[in-house]
């Protein structure tokens, strides 16, 4: 067995052990035990790795699928907990920093905006944006609206009414961003005419937790969206133990031209896929965001510099802050 295979086997064994420990927890609601295990999991999955999670043995693949479901459940409980905590403030938006991973959303939203601005032909100045899978803490929408798209209206969609009720409370005292935010209880598969009203559609990482489910969302978007851009969050390498991996070819088959794929190797865990729907996008051959051409089937891949050491230090600090916030709450 070569060194790379040994590295992959060791990682899979470690992740399998963490999955077993997480699965035995009596609850995935925020607690020191839950936080410690998920911190260990993220720390194990974030560094660059040669693992291809789509080629795991069936037993490991089943473990991965179960782990992604556990991650989704834990993330939902964590966000609901902090949404309730923030709602206790007179102006919740002044206290978003109490959430341990708020800085990650700032960095991810900045990356997504920069990729859209760089690769979407003609730049990006959307009047209306849909964010599908916003959840009880719609940080991505908020950061984009407050920092990058000050004139844009955001419609946030999630199929759980309780999540929307929580999200709505966070914006009750804000007259700027709050006036540009609305929340709708709906599944992406049920959206048809609405999709034609948006210039950009964001698809969150856990929308359609199985890769095949997420892939099915792309033809639906392609059938109902107006000409414009779609941004899909995915994962790469060992981060595929945390989130579903979306194949850019599936997006292409859904009626989109994939303009760019970004696999960050820093504290931004999600990969980002930029795609564009246009009825005449192939009339003159695919084009990149700078006006040049690239061969059909090839996509520019952008990878920011690795800041893993800083990320580990930040995770440790946030873990301590989380424990303090739990006590205070």
From Swiss-Prot:
| GO BP annotation list | nicotianamine biosynthetic process
GO function terms (MF aspect): nicotianamine synthase activity
Task: Report any Pfam family annotated for this entry.
Answer: NAS
Q: Which reaction does it catalyse?
A: 3 S-adenosyl-L-methionine = nicotianamine + 3 S-methyl-5'-thioadenosine + 3 H(+)
Write out the transmembrane intervals. Answer: none
List all disulphide bridges recorded for this chain.
Answer: none
Q: What is its EC number?
A: 2.5.1.43
What are the entry keywords? S-adenosyl-L-methionine, Transferase
**Superkingdom of origin:** Eukaryota
**What is the enzyme's main class?**
transferase
What is the purpose of this protein? Synthesizes nicotianamine, a polyamine that is the first intermediate in the synthesis of the phytosiderophores of the mugineic acid type found in gramineae which serves as a sensor for the physiological iron status within the plant, and/or might be involved in the transport of iron.
Name the protein family: Belongs to the nicotianamine synthase (NAS)-like family.
Q: List the protein's name.
A: Probable nicotianamine synthase 7
Q: Which organism is it from?
A: Hordeum vulgare
Q: What is the lineage of its organism?
A: Eukaryota, Viridiplantae, Streptophyta, Embryophyta, Tracheophyta
Q: What gene name is listed for this protein?
A: NAS7
């Amino acid at each position: 067995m070569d060194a790379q295979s040994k590295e992959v086997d060791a990682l899979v064994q470690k992740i399998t052990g963490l999955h077993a420990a997480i699965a035995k927890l009596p609850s995935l609601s925020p607690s020191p035990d839950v936080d410690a295990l998920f911190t260990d999991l993220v720390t194990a999955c974030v560094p660059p790795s040669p693992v291809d999670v789509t080629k795991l043995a069936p037993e490991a693949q089943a473990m991965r699928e179960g782990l992604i479901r556990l991650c989704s459940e834990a993330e939902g409980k964590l966000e609901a907990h902090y949404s309730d905590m923030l709602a206790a403030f007179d102006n919740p938006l002044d206290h978003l920093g109490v959430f341990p991973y708020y800085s990650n959303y700032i960095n991810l939203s900045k990356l997504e905006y920069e990729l859209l601005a760089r690769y979407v032909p003609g730049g990006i100045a959307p009047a209306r944006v849909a964010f599908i899978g916003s959840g009880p803490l719609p940080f991505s929408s908020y950061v984009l609206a407050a920092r990058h798209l000050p004139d844009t209206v955001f419609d946030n969609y999630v199929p759980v009414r309780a999540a929307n009720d929580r999200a709505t409370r966070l914006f009750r005292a804000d007259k700027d961003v709050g006036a540009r935010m609305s929340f709708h209880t709906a599944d992406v598969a049920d959206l048809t005419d609405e999709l034609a009203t948006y210039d950009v559609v964001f698809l969150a990482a856990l929308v359609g937790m199985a890769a095949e489910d997420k892939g099915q969302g792309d033809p639906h978007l392609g059938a109902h969206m107006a000409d414009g851009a779609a941004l899909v969050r995915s994962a790469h390498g060992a981060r595929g133990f945390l989130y579903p991996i979306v194949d850019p070819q599936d997006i292409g088959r859904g009626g989109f031209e994939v303009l760019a794929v970004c696999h960050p190797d820093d504290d931004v865990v999600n990969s980002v896929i930029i795609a564009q729907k246009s009825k005449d996008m192939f009339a003159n051959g695919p084009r990149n965001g700078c006006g040049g051409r690239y061969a059909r089937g090839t996509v520019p891949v952008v990878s920011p510099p690795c800041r893993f050491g800083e990320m580990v230090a930040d995770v440790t600090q946030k873990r301590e802050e989380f424990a303090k916030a739990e006590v205070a709450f």
